[in-house]
Amino acid sequence: MTEEVCSEPGDCETARLKIGAVLLAAGNGARLGGRAKGAIEIAGEPLLLRGLRILSEVGVDEVAVVTGHYHSEVSPLMAQAERLFDDDRLVEVTQPIADHAQADSLRLGVASLSQEVDAVMVLPVDMPALTRGDLVALIGAYKHADPGIEFVGPTVGTRPGNPVLFSRRIASQIVQGQGDFGSGAWRHQRSDWLLEWQTDNLHYLADIDTPEDLDGWIQ
């Protein structure tokens, strides 16, 4: 499976999935010196709005944005994002635990999606290289995966990337707190569910974790 599958507009029109997305924006940005990643502007656009824009462009049906640390900086951006989505397709949920793990935010976000979604896409907020085409390609890989595949994630060489897309079955397990989702042990245990979708697209790896990462984007 390569990223060319479903990479053009219109390729994903048949057998349409109802997709919910979780945009993770609750972290404390400790390695970045303590900054709200969602409020960082790249080419004049805050990362939170960029992530929501490409999710809107790809046509996801619902989005849950998980905020937490720096809520006061990130939350006002949600008002600007409402123009991208109709009705109640966009919700914000706030992680109440200050010292939380990403798994806690993931569980909160997935639980905020309706039971009507067929699959869930999880996107960290700090991935400025991603485009609409990258997300469409991931959806295509998921739709064209072999029967029994429940999870598709991009893999560049041996490095797992983001975003990932998984089934309602996995979403239910996450909400119920079953297993350490996404860990090496989980991937080994659930290898029959997992498609490590091979691609050479570095967009799936590019994130902003450190000041050096950020410098590479603002210079």
Regions found by a protein language model. Name each.
Residues T155-G157, F166-R169:
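Short, loop-centered acidic/histidine patches that primarily coordinate divalent metals
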Residues G29, I40, A171-S172, D215:
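Nucleotide phosphate-binding site architecture
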Residues C12-P160, D192-T199:
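Nucleotide and nucleotide-moiety/phosphate-recognizing core
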Residues R107-G109, R169-I174:
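Short beta-strand and adjoining strand-loop segment in the mid-core
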Residues N162-F166, A206-I208:
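Short glycine- and hydrophobic/aromatic-rich loop-to-beta-strand nucleating segment
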Residues T2-L17, S172, Q176-Q219:
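Conserved alpha/beta core of the MobA/IspD/sugar-nucleotide pyrophosphorylase nucleotidyltransferase superfamily
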Residues Y70-E73, I170, D213:
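Short phosphate-engaging motifs
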